[in-house]
């Protein structure tokens, strides 16, 4: 089987027989995460746009053809439900806590959409959440099974860790074990954000007694997933002024338990939420937005906003239930080209998420 690292793997078998010299590139483009091999549709399109690239002209060509780095979406977020069981400090208040008060994406539309995603992108990670919690979606297992029919698609479940039935977790983990793929069949992110019930109460705006119960339930859920599917669970803490003092104990605790942790930067959603950032992590020089380059967000009614920051869909690119995905994707190209020219208007001018990167 062909391996993209076969040259290094071959040299490594007898590395002392080779004279290796490390060369530092005059222009650093590592942040662009370029991969010039054709193992996916996105990479093929990228290679096709740079057939004349060399070690001498790479910086000039990439700068001149930065528009070509936006190929097809690699990350989709399907809003199966708008409901979320907690009113966390980092969540817009416009999302309801009860599923009966929230819109649901029709299962038939979701499954049809998944088939079209597989045709358009071929390889992608599909998150089953935008701001809602997929545990509240009645047909979750059916949607996951539909996604895993396609070998190029993976599932990401972002959840509070509350309200999960053991049988559902067991079924999903069994589906994952039967559908091995890269980077994972099903990945899990659990929003914990605290190690103490007092901090959990503050971050998720619940009473102390509720916090004790919820934190215990979410912790047990995380450990259940880890026990059945090790290596694909990420406990997450949103780093904010409010919970900064628990960042280190959170990291140490969960690193020891499951081996991996996500420390997520706080997103004020372009000023919609108060600024609770502990520090400004943005690069010294701004570059085009990763999310405009590789993400597509789809709301329960099929509307496609410009990005996740477009909470109220005031910059809609189209409707995924009614229009071709390629056509919708092309409509985002103009805003991306503005970023290439260092023009950041409207939401983009207030955004602090452009340098963050999804799976």
Swiss-Prot record:
Spell out the InterPro entries in the cross-references: 4Fe4S-binding_SPASM_dom, Aldolase_TIM, Radical_SAM_PqqE_MftC-like, Spiro_SPASM
Xref: NCBIfam families: spiroSPASM
Tell me the protein's name: Uncharacterized protein TP_0285
């Amino acid at each position: 089987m062909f391996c993209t690292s076969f040259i290094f793997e071959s040299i490594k078998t007898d590395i002392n027989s080779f004279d290796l010299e490390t060369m530092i590139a005059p222009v650093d483009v590592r942040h662009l995460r370029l991969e010039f091999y054709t193992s996916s549709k996105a990479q093929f399109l990228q290679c096709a746009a740079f057939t004349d690239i060399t070690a001498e002209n790479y910086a000039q060509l990439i700068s001149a053809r930065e528009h070509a780095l936006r190929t097809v979406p690699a990350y989709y977020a399907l809003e199966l439900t708008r409901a979320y069981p907690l009113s966390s400090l980092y969540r817009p208040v416009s999302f309801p806590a009860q599923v009966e008060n929230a819109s649901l994406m029709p299962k038939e539309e979701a499954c049809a959409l998944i088939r079209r995603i597989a045709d358009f992108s071929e390889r992608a990670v599909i998150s089953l959440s935008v701001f809602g919690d997929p545990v509240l979606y009645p047909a979750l297992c059916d949607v996951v099974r539909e996604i895993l029919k396609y070998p190029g698609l993976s599932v990401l479940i972002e959840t509070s860790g509350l309200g999960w039935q053991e049988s559902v977790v067991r079924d999903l983990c069994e589906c994952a074990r039967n559908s091995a793929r890269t980077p994972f069949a099903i990945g899990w992110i659990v929003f914990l954000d605290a190690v103490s019930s007092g901090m959990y109460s503050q971050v998720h705006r619940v009473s102390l007694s509720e916090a004790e119960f919820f934190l215990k339930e979410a912790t047990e859920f995380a450990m259940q997933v880890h026990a059945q599917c090790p290596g694909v669970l990420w406990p997450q803490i949103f780093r904010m002024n409010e919970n900064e003092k628990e960042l280190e104990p959170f990291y140490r605790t969960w690193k020891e338990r499951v081996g991996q942790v996500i420390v997520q930067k706080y997103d004020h959603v372009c000023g919609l939420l108060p600024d609770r950032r502990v520090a400004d992590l943005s690069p010294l020089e701004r570059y085009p937005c990763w999310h405009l380059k590789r993400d597509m967000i789809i709301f329960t009614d099929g509307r496609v906003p410009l990005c996740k920051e477009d909470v109220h869909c005031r910059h809609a690119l189209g409707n995924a239930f009614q229009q071709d995905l390629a056509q919708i994707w092309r409509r985002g190209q103009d805003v991306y080209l503005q970023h290439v020219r260092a023009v950041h208007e409207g939401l983009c001018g207030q955004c602090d998420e452009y340098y963050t990167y999804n799976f």
